[in-house]
UniProtKB/Swiss-Prot annotation:
One of its GO terms (molecular function) is potassium channel regulator activity. Its main location: secreted. This is Potassium channel toxin alpha-KTx 17.2. Residues 1-26 form the signal peptide. Keywords: Disulfide bond, Ion channel impairing toxin, Neurotoxin, Potassium channel impairing toxin, Secreted, Signal, Toxin. Disulfide bonds join 30-46, 36-51, 40-53. Inhibits voltage-gated potassium channels.
């Protein structure tokens, strides 16, 4: 039982580290809408530091 709990905690910690890695954040980080043009063909908005793109469909 302790082994399962330890493995679960390690998985959660590993996921948190990967999510907060600088490279992952750098990919869509923005201050203004124009910062998103290198990530999106059609920029929807920059909100809370994240780029949102318009997708055809």
């Amino acid at each position: 039982m302790k082994t399962i709990i330890v493995l679960l905690l390690l998985t959660i910690v590993a996921a948190a580290v990967v999510e907060s890695s600088p490279k992952a954040r750098r990919q869509t980080e923005c201050q203004i809408k124009n910062d998103c043009q290198r990530y999106c063909q059609s920029v929807k908005e920059c909100k809370y530091g994240k780029c949102y793109c318009n997708y055809a469909g």
